[in-house]
Amino acid sequence: MPPHRDGGQAQFIERPVADEGSPWLSKLLEWVQRHLTDDLTTGRLARQACVSKRTLARRFLETTGTSPADWVTGLRIALAKELLETTTLSVEEVADRCGFGSSFTLRHHFRKRLQTNPLAYRAGFRVPEVG
């Protein structure tokens, strides 16, 4: 079920922010947000952070409690939620703008993480028409 606020006000989810004590992660987070539509493999993230894939995975787990792939998927889901809340883009267009590659992949991750589909999520943010 999508988040809800009384009065028809959409509830916006802030983007995750890296811990100030992790400058390497802050820099990587900024880079990833500029490249969300790219193919962001763990190898590519490791190269960007100038570390091995193993070091990246270990540091990620220590700092965020999750894997790099789950982290990127979370960023993409957050962007998809924002677009669904604030635009009339089709699910296909939202998937493309978020880097999912296909609407099928977006729906898969949406259902897995939010137990709903993109259209049902969007419907939770429509303001009911009066009269």
Residue ranges and their predicted role:
Residues H4-Q9, E20-T41, F60-T64, K81-S90, ...:
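Basic, amphipathic alpha-helical hairpins
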Residues I13-A18:
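HhH-family (HhH-GPD) DNA N-glycosylase catalytic core used in base-excision repair
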Residues D39-G43, V51, L61-S102, A123-G131:
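Terminal helix-turn-helix DNA-binding modules in bacterial transcription factors
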